[in-house]
Regions:
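Nuclease catalytic cores that cleave nucleic-acid phosphodiester bonds
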Residues: 89-214
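Domain-level signal for Mg2+-assisted phosphodiester chemistry and nucleotide/NA-binding surfaces
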Residues: 2-112, 161
């Protein structure tokens, strides 16, 4: 990790990663890096660590999409691939449909917005810190709504640190200012953190990388 403020060195630092799934997804989409959607998130996180750091667990926060059907299928395939990873857990929020007016044409449409991810991440970070399960919380997000748990960690558990890893095309000055360190996830990390083209589940079923993600 880079751009990290000075801290007391230790023989080994336990790291738990907290990944804001849609913040990462929309960052990749903004960068037009669809070929990196097929990410082994555990490997991506591992590739961000320093030699003295050990990845204890990866927590992925997302919501199930329900339309269009082809997008729902691609997400389901990706989630099933993630479920083959032993030290990764998925936490679900939900979509809430909001009626919005188009600025250009004036028509109204239902626009889904993802809910609960920031709350779920905050709860997990604070819970893990309280149970002394980590030395470093690695937050993969640029959502400024996540400043509150960083402040809480610094106040309640000053011996622990929060490092922010910004997804591609994403940044938050507030998170950068509050965190103990930060980095930007780049192409090189993503390129070496992909699942293989085919992923076999425990029951023998083989998952295929979606064609649109190649």
């Amino acid at each position: 990790m880079t751009n990290e403020k000075s801290s007391t060195a230790s023989s080994e630092q336990r790291v738990i990663a907290y990944i804001d799934g849609f913040n990462l997804y929309f960052g990749l989409r903004s960068a037009k890096w669809q070929r990196f959607y097929w990410l082994n998130l555990q490997l991506m996180t591992q590739n961000l660590l320093k030699p003295e750091q050990r990845l204890v667990f990866t927590k992925y926060f997302t919501s199930r999409v329900s339309y269009p059907p082809e997008k729902e299928q691609r997400q389901s395939t990706f989630i099933e691939a993630l479920e083959t990873l032993s030290d990764l857990r998925i936490y679900y929020g939900h979509y809430q449909a909001n009626l919005r007016r188009c600025r250009n044409c004036g028509n109204k449409e239902m626009v889904p917005s993802e809910k609960m991810t920031d709350v779920n991440i905050a709860v997990e970070i604070l819970s893990d810190a309280y149970q002394d399960l980590l030395d470093v919380a690695l937050l993969v997000s640029a959502d400024s709504d996540l400043t509150a748990p960083i402040v809480a960690i610094k106040n309640l558990f000053p011996q622990k640190r929060v490092i922010v890893a910004f997804p591609p095309q994403r940044h938050s000055a507030q998170l950068q200012h509050l965190a103990h360190g930060f980095l930007q996830i780049g192409r090189a990390n993503l390129a070496k953190s992909l699942f293989p083209e085919k992923v076999q589940k425990a029951d023998g079923f083989v998952l295929q990388r979606p064609a649109e993600w190649r």
